[in-house]
């Protein structure tokens, strides 16, 4: 195959957003919500093309009359029919590229069940007829995009958070930690604490409004207890937000109480350790000789690491846990919302990567299990 002249397509399937584009670009051409919406009462949508499903932004704009579903939960695909719709939309509507003409690089969550990546492989070759494909682990791509091959990635998106120690380009599976606490949980928690203020948000459409409030107004306190005290004494941290109907609501200490759950999951009724402790535990599971390299290269990735104040707070909390002489460095690249995609763009453009693709011939010969031999 003359793969040199054909650009690969890179698709990062997140629980919240799909990031898609062409290898070699420095940013995804298309970012849209991983949503499939179906009419609440079929037959109601007069004068609109009778579609049984809407994907992405179109589902978002018509959300009032649709039931919205996310086919990826906690980083793992739970509804393959909807997932196929999302991929179809990605290739044909967003990228306007025929998948049978391009190698496709997909991403997956660390510790993804084996059956999941086999199913991805099968759909790509059998439904979309791709000439070649590859499945890469999201956190490893984020590290590549930061220009490193060794470090620990704290990747937190909409559906799941992971800490993934990587040494010389290889993830260390025994030390990967997974935390089922990410952006979607924080949005739900913000809905809950806004309820206590008397603002009732409940439908799937209203949840999207709360997500927007979270992204625009929330931040992480360096010291939570002190911030709470300050917020009780003054109204400086109060901000107003205009709802789509023109009403204005006021958001106060919810601004930092919401993302505090990343450090204190007990706020959500979860027994898990916070992201600082999880990162520390992940490093402790690694060989003592490489820990220094990991402590000095803690790389943030994913939309849920975009809160103001997260780098300072993590540095402080991990310094408290780590050996006292250890130098702690948290790296927060400005483009970290898309660093998984950027890493995929870099990887699939490398000349050395071209022999890594799983080709159609190999798939026909070995079946879906080929993915475990070629993608690691």
From Swiss-Prot:
Catalysed reaction(s) here are:
ATP + H2O = ADP + phosphate + H(+)
What activity regulation does UniProt give?
A: ATP hydrolysis occurs in the polymeric state. Unlike for mammalian actin, ATP hydrolysis occurs also in the monomeric form and the release of inorganic phosphate (Pi) is more efficient.
Q: What is its main location?
A: cytoplasm
According to its UniProt record, this protein's enzyme class is hydrolase
Entry's Gene Ontology cellular component terms: actin cytoskeleton; actin filament; cytoplasm; nucleus
Q: What is its EC number?
A: 3.6.4.-
Site (Not methylated): give the residues: 74
Q: Give the range the annotation lists for the signal sequence.
A: none
Q: What happens when the gene is disrupted?
A: Conditional knockout at the ring stage results in the production of merozoites; however, these merozoites fail to start a new infection cycle due to a failure to invade new host erythrocytes. During schizogony, daughter merozoite development and segmentation is abnormal and is characterized by the presence of aberrant membranous pockets adjacent to the food vacuole. Apicoplasts have few branches and collapse close to the food vacuole failing to migrate to individual daughter cells.
Classification via InterPro entries: Actin (IPR004000), Actin/actin-like_CS (IPR020902), Actin_CS (IPR004001), ATPase_NBD (IPR043129)
Is ATP-binding set as a keyword in this record? yes
User: Quick check: keyword ATP-binding in the entry?
Assistant: yes
Q: Which UniProt keywords apply?
A: ATP-binding, Cytoplasm, Cytoskeleton, Hydrolase, Nucleotide-binding, Nucleus
Residues reported to bind ATP: 15-17, 19, 158-160, 214-215, 303
Which effect does the record note for changing residue 49 to G? Increases inorganic phosphate (Pi) release in presence of Mg(2+). No effect of K(+) on Pi release. No effect on Pi release in absence or in presence of K(+)
What Pfam families does the entry give? Actin
List localization entries: Cytoplasm; Nucleus; Cytoplasm, Cytoskeleton
The impact of changing residue 272 to W is: Forms longer filaments. 18.9-fold increase in inorganic phosphate (Pi) release in presence of Mg(2+). Filament elongation rate is normal
Q: Which GO terms describe its molecular function?
A: ATP binding; ATP hydrolysis activity; structural constituent of cytoskeleton
Using the UniProt annotation, give all residue ranges assigned to the region (DNAseI-binding D loop): 40-61
Q: What is the effect of changing residue 42 to Q?
A: Reduces inorganic phosphate (Pi) release in presence of Mg(2+). No effect of K(+) on Pi release. No effect on Pi release in absence or in presence of K(+)
Coiled-coil regions, chain positions: none
Explain the purpose of this protein.
Actin is a highly conserved protein that polymerizes to produce filaments that form cross-linked networks in the cytoplasm. Polymerizes into shorter and less stable actin filaments compared to ACT2/actin-2; this is thought to facilitate gliding motility and host cell invasion. Has ATPase activity. ATP hydrolysis leads to the formation of a stable intermediate ADP-inorganic phosphate (Pi) actin, which is followed by the release of Pi. ATP hydrolysis affects filament stability; ADP-bound actin depolymerizes much faster than ATP- or ADP-Pi-bound actin.
Q: Which family does it belong to?
A: Belongs to the actin family.
The protein's name is Actin-1
Top-level taxonomy:
Eukaryota, Sar, Alveolata, Apicomplexa, Aconoidasida
The UniProt gene name for this protein comes to ACT1
């Amino acid at each position: 195959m003359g793969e040199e002249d054909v650009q690969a397509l890179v698709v990062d399937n997140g629980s919240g957003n799909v990031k898609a584009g062409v290898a070699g670009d420095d940013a995804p051409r298309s970012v849209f919500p991983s949503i499939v919406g179906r009419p609440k009462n079929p037959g109601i949508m007069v004068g609109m093309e009778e579609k049984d499903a809407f994907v992405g932004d179109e589902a978002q704009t018509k959300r009032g009359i649709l039931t919205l579903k996310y086919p990826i939960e906690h980083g793992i695909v739970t509804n393959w029919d909807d997932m196929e719709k999302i991929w179809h939309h990605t290739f044909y509507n967003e990228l306007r590229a025929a998948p049978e003409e391009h190698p496709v690089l997909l991403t997956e969550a660390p510790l993804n069940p084996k059956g999941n990546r086999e199913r991805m492989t099968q759909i790509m070759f059998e439904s979309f007829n791709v000439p070649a494909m590859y499945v890469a682990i999201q956190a490893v791509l984020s590290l590549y995009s930061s220009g490193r091959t060794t470090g620990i990635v704290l990747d937190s998106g909409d559906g799941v958070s992971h800490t993934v120690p990587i040494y010389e380009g290889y993830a260390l599976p025994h030390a990967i930690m997974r935390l089922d606490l990410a952006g979607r949980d924080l949005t739900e928690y913000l809905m809950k604490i806004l309820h206590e203020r008397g603002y009732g948000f409940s439908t799937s459409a209203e949840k999207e409004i709360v997500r927007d409030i979270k992204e625009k107004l929330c931040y992480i306190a360096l010291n939570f207890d002190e911030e709470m005290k300050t917020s009780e004494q003054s109204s400086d941290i109060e901000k107003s937000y205009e709802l789509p109907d023109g009403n204005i609501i006021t958001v106060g200490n919810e601004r930092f109480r919401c993302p505090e759950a990343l450090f204190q999951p007990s706020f959500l009724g979860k027994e898990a350790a916070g992201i600082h402790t999880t990162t520390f535990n992940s490093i402790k599971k690694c060989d003592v000789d490489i820990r220094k390299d990991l402590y000095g290269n803690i790389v943030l990735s994913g939309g849920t690491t975009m809160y103001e104040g997260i780098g300072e707070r993590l540095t402080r909390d991990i310094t408290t846990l780590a050996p006292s002489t250890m130098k702690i460095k948290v790296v927060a690249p400005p483009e970290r919302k898309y660093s998984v995609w950027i890493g995929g763009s870099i990887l699939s453009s490398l000349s050395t990567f071209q022999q890594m693709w799983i080709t159609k011939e190999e798939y026909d010969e070995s079946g879906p299990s080929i993915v475990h031999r070629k993608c690691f």
